[in-house]
Amino acid sequence: MGPILVLLVLLSLLEPGSANYDPCLDFDPENCTLTFAPDTSRICGVLIKCGWECRSVEITHNNKTWNNTLSTTWEPGVPEWYTVSVRGPDGSIRISNNTFIFSEMCDLAMFMSKQYSLWPPSKDNIVTFSIAYCLCACLLTALLCVCIHLLVTTRIKNANNKEKMP
């Protein structure tokens, strides 16, 4: 029994057949991250990153196409969607049209940065710019948590009132 366990452990560590594993098979085209790419020459820079483990990912936004990472700009009038396409090993293409609230994200960051003379970011104010951005994100998260808490407590209170009614 002991040698069989050792053999199973070694086989699970070596994972035979894992060299043929294709990470593009499990890649979710909707699982991308969007962050700002601050640059002095851009109104609002956005950095879209998708799937470093899969080389056949193409991101398209505003008539620009790039593999895995796309640095683009957003301004009013530019579409708020981007397309992610993944080419499978059999040649088939999976396409996902993702929408994102570029306008709200850019408006909030630009307002906060201009309010405190943080735009355009430079070596002198990048720390302050980052702190202001994080504080905005924390404020929005706290507001969301308070709203969810109020919703839950109101539903519990309403459920208790319904039980007491004859």
Swiss-Prot record:
Subcellular location: Host endoplasmic reticulum membrane
Cellular component annotations (GO), alphabetically ordered: host cell endoplasmic reticulum membrane; membrane
Chief site of localization: host cell
TM region(s), chain numbering: 132-152
Organism this protein belongs to: Human adenovirus B serotype 11 (strain Slobiski) (HAdV-11)
UniProt superkingdom: Viruses
Membrane topology: Single-pass type I membrane protein
Protein name in UniProt: Early E3 18.5 kDa glycoprotein
One record GO biological process: symbiont-mediated suppression of host antigen processing and presentation of peptide antigen via MHC class I
Signal peptide: 1-19
Similarity comment: family membership: Belongs to the adenoviridae E19 family.
Keywords annotated in UniProt: Disulfide bond, Early protein, Glycoprotein, Host endoplasmic reticulum, Host membrane, Host-virus interaction, Inhibition of host adaptive immune response by virus, Inhibition of host tapasin by virus, Lectin, Mannose-binding, Membrane, Signal, Transmembrane, Transmembrane helix, Viral immunoevasion
